[in-house]
Each structure stands twice: as structure tokens, then as C-alpha cells.
Amino acid sequence: MESKLGLNLELVNQARQSAAHVADDTQRFIDQHTTVTVERAVCRLLGIDGVNEMDVPLPNVVVDHMMATSFLPMGAAWAIGNAMLETGKDPQAVAEAIDKGELDLSKVPAHSDEEIRAAITPVVNATVERINKNVAKRNSYLKEWGDKEGPYLYIIVATGNIYEDIIQAKAGAKQGADIIAVIRTTGQSLLDYVPYGATTEGFGGTYATQENFRLMRAALDEVGEEQHRYIRLCNYCSGLCMPEIAAMGALERLDVMLNDALYGILFRDINMQRTIVDQYFSRVINGYAGVIINTGEDNYLTTDDAITAAHTVLASQFLNEAFAKDAGMREEQMGLGHAFEMDPAVENTFLYELAQAQMAREIFPNAPLKYMPPTKFMTGNIFRGHIQDALFNMVTILTNQRLCLLGMMTEAIHTPFMSDRALSIENAQYIFRTMKDLGSELTYKENGIIRNRADEVLTKATDLLKEIEKLGLFTTIEKGIFADVKRPKDGGKGLAGVVVKDDKYFNPFIEVMKGKVAAE
């Protein structure tokens, strides 16, 4: 890619190297530990589904039983495979027997590791084949209809009722949206289980459940076939159930997933040890399922200043890239996040926003960057808000951002109406059409505001990453370097669900999926 900013590539390399060292150091911790939700995700991928009479998901029943008997370090795959050999039951029947109190995994006579792997392999292969078929179907649609060039128009629905969401999502797709994100109900990231079935009551969003995923996927396929284009579905595998929701998304052919441990640590007070382990398995699954992940750097600028803290966003992007690579993800799946969140009362902020967006594009040339619209300084004045969104759209097309979450002029007033989305889509389409090639016509002068801003942010980010390399990720978070939010290593939610792996532990899905993409 031609550089318009004349970035110091040596600094880029130094930053990337520091981030890789931080990720590799953290990976040593990850490799030694598992968590309750990692093992519940293994249960789900082994075909354990449904809830008991008390509406407790059966994966929770199995893993809670393993925690209560101090058996979780063995891992769900080993324990269930061993029980399959002893009882002749499949994983679902094993889970149901545990729920009835008929089976204690910790008391089942131990079979050899070779026998256990042989017993569980056909089940693993069946799940992997289901994911392969999902990826093949997505690829088939894209081959038939082609994929969109330029930014994806990305909108959200958030009614709380999946059936109402479907109506709004289909309307948005017909209006021109390329990605539909179903916002989760407020606080779902703090639930240490995944609700079951179709849901009609949520607050600020709709519960992420596998049935809701299935219903929305079918609805978007229906409208996609009418429109002769593939409509991507987005949801959220952040919080205390990251890998479980990633597994559900892989099984139901979701295309985009919000996925960022740092977001959960900083903004949901989830324990850092817990969520960094959870993130790894969730990214292995997303990588294999061909899912684009979205990271949450844009949120830093809601609690910190977008001008003075811009380097923390870039540093986090480097870290998220390194963690994604360690999970075997391709750069084309790394939707690194940033945002148009500077105070419009400050002079030349459009130039600063343009500089930072172009900088991200040049540093991460293969990444489908996720660009977020203004929210912090939206006042409820819909006329000014529409102009702010237009300026955001201009930066999007000038710098070739890929996932463009459309701003709403009614931001800070109410959840968008369908008419609000229609106007937002029209705004973006107008600007993207009339400015399609303007970016390639522009150059930025040496020692000008734009180049100097990019140099400043890159230099500060590189220095910060060198500091993080010395401190380690956990200490960095404790110091409040990201988003001006401090979190203790042993605080937050979910630490009790982290255990050290036994020597016999294995996760067959990491072995099969890591570094690969289904149907390729």
C-alpha cells in the first residue's frame, strides 16, 4: 500500500515486536489455565444442548459438577470421553445422567488417553463438519452474488424481542445495510451462563441465544436471496461466556463477532485472568469459522480524551493483532476498532481524525478495520448530529475503512427508529458514492498537520508498548493505562472460574481448529 503519511516503518516494526512479546508472555499464562466457560464451550461443541427442569443449561450442569468435585482441571473433553467409554452413552446422555445424579465424572474408572481420544474424535469431527458446511454455504453465497467493495454499511437493532429485531433487520437490509448487529440485553456479559431459546424480553438489547442466532440468520438469508447479496450477521462474544457464544456463532453461521478481553476487563469489570484465557479459545473458534472479530478500542475514547489518549487506541490495536495471531487468526479477520470521537469544539479535529484513520489503515493494511461513529459529543441536536455523521462517513471513505458502523442523528435521544436508519444509510451511500475515489487523489504535505499528528500518535504508542513489554499486560491494566480505568489482577468477576490444567488435559477443538479456516 502506498503510504500517504510517510510513517516511520521502524517504529511500526518496534511496536509490533513489543506487542508480540506481550502477547507471547501472556500466552504462557493462557496455556496453563482453563476456565468454566472454556469447558462449557467444549461441552456445547460436543453436542451438549438444552436445559434441565430448572432452566439451567446442561453445559453449566456438567461444568458446575466438575468444579464441585475438583475435576475441572482434567477438562470436559477428557472427562466426557472417559464417561462415554465407561457408560456407552453419547455426550448429551452423559450430561443428562449427571443432571439426574446418576453419574459422577470424578468416580468413573480412568481409561487410557488414547482410548478417550478415539471415543471423542467422531463427535469432534461431526461438529467440525457442521462448521465446515456453514463456511462453505457463506462462501457459496459470496461466490454467487459477489462481495461488496468499499465500506460495509453496519447497523444495529436492539428491541429486546428477537421477532421485532427480525422485522427491523430485514427492513435495514432492504434499505442497503450490509451487516446487522443484534445488540445484547444490558448486562448479559455479566451472566456466567448463556440463556436458552427464543427471547422476547430484553433491556437495551436482545439476549444472545443460539435459537435467536438461528432465527436471525434464517431471516437475513431470506432477504439476502431477495436482494441477491449476502447480509452479514453480527453479535457479541464478550463477557463471561466468550468462547460459548463464539461456539454458538460458529454453529449458526454468524459472520462478525465483537470479541475483546480488554473491553470486558475495563468496562464490565471482568477479571483479567479469566477473560484473557476465554478470549484465546473464542478467537480460535472464530478464526476457524471465518468470522471477522471486532475489537473494542473505540470504547476507550468514551472515558478518556480522544485527542490525548489516541496512542492508547493504537497500542491496543497492536496488542489485539498479536493476540489474534497467537490464536491462529488471519489478518483479514481482524476488525480492529477505532472511532471518530473528538470534541467538535476543538479546531482541526477533522484533520486529526483523518490522520488517525489513515494511520490505522496504513499500519494494518489487510485488516477490515471497524470504524465507529461519534457518540460522546452527540447532543440530541439532530441536524448537527447528521452533519457529524457525514464528516465521519467522509473519513471512512477517504481512508478505506471496512466496517462502518453508521451513526444515528437521534443518538443520545432514543433507540433508532427504522426511519432513522434509512436516513443514516442514505447519508453514507451518498458520500461513499460521490467521494468513491477521492482518497486516491489526495496526498498529505510533509510537516503538515495530518502527517505530524500521525507521527505523534505512532511515536507515543510505540513508547507505550515498550513500557507494557516491561510491565506485562496485567500490571499495565492495574495501572489504568487503557481508558483511564484501573482494574486489579485478582479483582472483578469470574476469577473463581479459572483453574490450572492437569497434565492429562486436552482440548480437541483447539487442536483441530487453530490456524485453519473451515472449508479451505
Protein language model features and the residues they cover:
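Conserved, well-structured core segments that form the ligand-binding/active-site neighborhood
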Residues: G202-R330
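Alpha-helix-loop-beta-strand connector modules within alpha/beta enzyme cores
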Residues: K143-E144, V194-R232, I276-I293, F350-A367, ...
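Hydrophobic alpha-helical bundle architecture
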Residues: E353-D420, L438-G448
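Short, glycine-rich nucleotide/cofactor-binding loops
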Residues: I156-I162, E347, G380-G385
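Long, compositionally biased, glycine/small-hydrophobic-enriched stretches that function as flexible linkers
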Residues: M1-Y163, A171-G176, R184-N212, G239-I245, ...
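Hydrophobic faces of well-ordered beta-strands that scaffold small-molecule active sites
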Residues: P151-A158, I179-I183, R229-C237, V256-A261, ...
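Glycine-rich phosphate-binding active-site loops on the catalytic face of alpha/beta enzymes
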Residues: D178-S189, E252-D269, N320-E321, F392-T415
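Catalytic cores of alpha/beta
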Residues: Y163-K170, L240-R253, T308-A309, F383-I397
